[in-house]
């Protein structure tokens, strides 16, 4: 079979959650599994993370998918609801909602629900995306407190905009704003994402929201080294993306390789054609020199990434054969490195894996 393969190590996924819980024993873990479990498979990840205290998803469709397969854990929908039909489904399926705009408050007031709703009030402390301003939040909180449609206490949350930056000034300001505005509010609090989890221990409050770190990937990329050793020691990559060599060619000096003739052989040399391309989710903008792992050794990508194939330099691997597995990222080759080479972030690479890729689960 020549399809690219994403091998998902569910044991590593469980291990990563246990590490998070051990590092924040006083907090409950709200596992972020939005965007198809960060590309790892929504249902697969939810079933593996049964020890999570709750799940976070982006939209109601993701939440309903989990309920349909029998996931009974609390689920919080980060974008909340947008009409009466959705709101009714929230109540029917026991979904928690993030309340971030006045339209949602109005819907709550005019809709008769069959059961009360668990909600989190989102306070915008500086992300300037979703949420009520610091100035608006006390009034909205008091308004929600009077609603018979809402379970008490009301959750209180914010989102950190710059927690992966070594300059802590803005994030510390956000945390200060949040603590100040919620000082007289009663309810569970949640502040940190994966980066905040490591960098801001003072913000490890009632609930933490680990995302990318669940999948064994640093939220800091490769440029922020303060937590590099800790992350590498305690967390394991969950996804390994691999593909097979489908052809080996001996090329002459100055022969060009791939579309656009952007790379030429510096000498007579062997190259391998690997069965993966941007049609599978491998980044088209990965440049020549981007590493892959073949038989435990690094080989460089050469030429442009095609829809279905890439070419790699085999000069360091004269014994490579058709059928050998090539690791594009994962165990032995962090996806953060590939993201850096391609000028993007690991999150994007994981979420762009396409349906053509075969997913395999292992326990290792």
Curated annotation (Swiss-Prot):
Gene behind the chain: alr
Function description: Catalyzes the interconversion of L-alanine and D-alanine. May also act on other amino acids.
Protein name: Alanine racemase
Record-listed E.C. numbers: 5.1.1.1
Gene Ontology cellular component annotations, sorted alphabetically: cytosol
Organism: Coxiella burnetii (strain RSA 493 / Nine Mile phase I)
Binding site for substrate: 129, 307
GO terms for biological process, alphabetical: D-alanine biosynthetic process
Cofactor: pyridoxal 5'-phosphate
Catalytic activity: L-alanine = D-alanine
HAMAP family with a match to the protein in the record: Ala_racemase (MF_01201)
Keywords carried by this UniProt record: Isomerase, Pyridoxal phosphate
Family, as annotated: Belongs to the alanine racemase family.
Pathway: Amino-acid biosynthesis; D-alanine biosynthesis; D-alanine from L-alanine: step 1/1
Active site: 34, 259
GO MF annotation, one: alanine racemase activity
Modified positions (N6-(pyridoxal phosphate)lysine) in chain numbering: 34
